[in-house]
């Protein structure tokens, strides 16, 4: 199966439509994996939300600022296809940010409008909020899941990080299949 577009970028629409609950996408830097995934996440139906995961809380906090958000270039490159968005902390939930459609208020400031499109969090801190309900979250993207050599590993090394990822998937996915629902999907880029 060809998973590349004619322009050489990864065909994330095709990859993310595969029927597997856990997909690992490994490729060179700058091949459109994150960009393409963000396009697909912003195009989810209204009743479906996403969870965008980074390894550490520092990384999640950085991309929770619009100018550093991986969603920003998608919005700016495709203004006719996507509405403006707002990325900010979720009120009353520590360490989780949200992505909303944005609208200008009376003061000309872009503010969140309606329900969140999805959420941003960190693998290193998701265990602190276990037991929450995320039934509306249908897909997760774990961006930059392969650490660079100079990035310190989780306590417990790679096996600790692997266990944290499995716990994250279980926390968000719960028992959907037992209820006859589609499983939560996780795409690791």
Protein language model annotation of sequence segments:
Residues 2-189:
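Phosphate/NTP-binding elements of NTP-utilizing enzymes
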